């Protein structure tokens, strides 16, 4: 598979490499992504990718960073649409998270399974920004559910993230022996989980 040399000749090699990596991962998973094959897919020489990325992990970090930035934008829009009702805002953030994972499973895989390390400050900052939106929603939920026995806001944010990430992981990515068919849509599964959790906090329908 080749995406041609046009991008390279027009000085857009970096963008062509990121897009080629995203397509390869979407087709084969992270295990099917190698630098040499990436060069072939982008239609350039084996040495060309190193002009922009020092190695495979650096390219994965760039793909992940871009993914987190888009996820942050999606979560922020969902949060703004759901306010002022904190339960609605949390639910919409969850749906936005799930929609992102389903729409771009390759970037999602790079974000959470790519193992680029913690040495890229831009990637860490982008990941923190995405979680900050979930934390903001959790803060609002906790403020509305103030009372004895309520978990701290950080724990609520982690619980919500766990529900979102766990549901997305069950439904995205290439087939694997450990994945089993589920008798429901991912949105329904996530909505039910969030509803049960929010009710335990005294929120929700």
Give the role of each language-model region.
Residues 13-22, 38, 63-71, 75, ...:
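Generic hydrophobic, amphipathic alpha-helix propensity
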Residues 76-107, 128, 147-160:
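Hydrophobic alpha-helical connector segments
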Residues 1-12, 173-175, 179, 205:
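N-terminal intrinsically disordered/low-complexity leader segments
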Residues 119-143, 154-158, 184-199:
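Amphipathic alpha-helical packing segments from all-alpha helical-bundle domains
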Residues 20-27, 70-82, 163-170:
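Solvent-exposed, amphipathic alpha-helical segments
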Residues 16, 20, 24-58:
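Helix-turn-helix
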Residues 92, 99-136, 178-183:
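Short secondary-structure transition hinges
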Residues 16, 25, 60-67, 111, ...:
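Alpha-helical DNA-contacting segments of helix-turn-helix folds
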